[in-house]
Amino acid sequence: MSENQQALNHVVSMEDLTVDQVMKLIKRGIEFKNGAQLPYEDHPIVSNLFFEDSTRTHKSFEVAEIKLGLERLDFDVKTSSVNKGETLYDTILTLSALGVDVCVIRHPEVDYYRELIASPTITTSIINGGDGSGQHPSQSLLDLMTIYEEFGHFEGLKVAIAGDLDHSRVAKSNMQILKRLGAELFFAGPEEWRSQEFADYGKFVTIDEIIDQVDVMMFLRVQHERHDSGAVFSKEDYHAQHGLTQERYDRLKETAILMHPAPINRDVEIADHLVEAPKSRIVQQMTNGVFVRMAILESVLASRNAN
């Protein structure tokens, strides 16, 4: 086991991870990116259960599992007993009884995992692939890995998170850990989508007030599927008021980087031609997702082997 590895029973929330655990996962992800290998001779079994649509999280977990040599047990929500009314608890109870070691789960219910990890009967480890508008720890960790590769530290970095704050599990995961790591946080976006909980972690600003000062400019997707009513803004108005235009991009510091968890609404959060601009690290984020998820899986499986 690498000295950068630290065992975890579950990975469900950034609030539950210590700074030491976070840094070890980031550094282990970088080791995997640089070619470290860890073949499993006992063939642990992982099942991915996605109750919400996903491309990057779902597929990068699959690639991570393949690279680690794990056995993957396919789970298709549409053809499972979920459609007969089976609860999430009973689904995971079944997979645990079948001997599945790890379940990667995305679910629309915030904190769905609490009941699962509290159960004395369920022995499978849980990795949260996103719970509604709650937490998204693996996305946060890949974001941190991307920032760390760029700057080599977090202390004193100015990080702005802009967009649909209230509905973003990415924003909530990142604000908690970035503050603990010593970054200075700023939040921008429509006032209708930013609750007071963000004020405990940083300062509310407009994007034009902060764009030329930040080291990291992170945009968030407008999550139409989580809004109770129709669009508050037209796409054009939102982009003009809150998105990354060419003029705003030109105001970024020479050393600043642009991030977005994706999927991207092009010409809404970010102008289409800027998604792959020189300061963009969006593709690198996707790449890093595979390696940090390898580190997460390795750490969870190490915990199981130690018990």
Swiss-Prot record:
A Gene Ontology BP annotation from the UniProt entry: 'de novo' UMP biosynthetic process
Residues annotated for carbamoyl phosphate binding in this entry: R56, T57, R106, H136, Q139, A262, P263
Tagged with keyword Hydrolase: no
SUPFAM superfamilies the record matches: Aspartate/ornithine carbamoyltransferase (SSF53671)
EC numbers: 2.1.3.2
Catalysed transformations (reactions): carbamoyl phosphate + L-aspartate = N-carbamoyl-L-aspartate + phosphate + H(+)
Keywords on record: Pyrimidine biosynthesis, Transferase
Organism domain of life: Bacteria
UniProt keyword annotation of tRNA processing present: no
Binding residues annotated for L-aspartate, in chain numbering: K84, R169, R221
Xref: InterPro entries: Asp/Orn_carbamoyltranf_P-bd, Asp/Orn_carbamoylTrfase, Asp/Orn_carbamoylTrfase_sf, Asp_carbamoyltransf, Asp_carbamoyltransf_Asp/Orn-bd
Single annotated GO MF: aspartate carbamoyltransferase activity
Gene Ontology CC, one term: cytosol
Annotated Gene3D superfamilies: Aspartate/ornithine carbamoyltransferase (3.40.50.1370)
Pathway: Pyrimidine metabolism; UMP biosynthesis via de novo pathway; (S)-dihydroorotate from bicarbonate: step 2/3
Purpose: Catalyzes the condensation of carbamoyl phosphate and aspartate to form carbamoyl aspartate and inorganic phosphate, the committed step in the de novo pyrimidine nucleotide biosynthesis pathway.
Subunit structure of this chain's protein: Heterododecamer (2C3:3R2) of six catalytic PyrB chains organized as two trimers (C3), and six regulatory PyrI chains organized as three dimers (R2).
Similarity section: Belongs to the aspartate/ornithine carbamoyltransferase superfamily. ATCase family.
Protein name: Aspartate carbamoyltransferase catalytic subunit
Lineage: Bacteria, Bacillati, Bacillota, Bacilli, Lactobacillales
